[in-house]
Amino acid sequence: MFNVGDFIVYPMHGAGTIDAIEEKDILGEKQSYYILKMPGEVKVMVPTDKAEKIGVRNIIDKSSAEKVFSILEEDETEMSMNWNKRYRDNMEKMKSGDIYEVADVVRNLSFKQKEKGLSTGEKKMLNNAKQILVSELVLAERSSYEEMENIVDNKINQSFKEFRIDEESPLTNMVNKFIPFNE
């Protein structure tokens, strides 16, 4: 059970605060609800008895935030070449509410965006995943949204440079790697 003032994460929406716990009469049935204050002044009502099943959880601590940062600093994990399958796989990771899975989506889609661009759907997914990730890290690290967004971007940029030989021309790197030129 959560209390008023607790920082929580609601899958697919990000981190927020429990603003209140209220009883509502819906269709003649009294039900207790958490009133969640989410980013962008959005309020969400979640039945208290279904919160855990829905995936509402406490925010991560500082040591878990460090693990998130280390995921952002790794090379991308293998993703399907098929856009549709990749999209479904990433959506499942985001729906899980697991911040490490969300960090994986942010890093992988950021790499793909830098290498060859993203479709409109994947751009939207990247923006949503990044908002979810940053909103939780802001509360875990007690920092501003802008500061945390810069940290996330910098970690991804550093890892991209580290794991990609020449970010200007990945195709040239592949050709040079596999086709030796005799001098």
Stretch-by-stretch model annotation:
Residues 1-56:
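A positional/architectural concept
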Residues 49, 54-183:
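Charge/polar-rich, low-complexity and marginally structured segments
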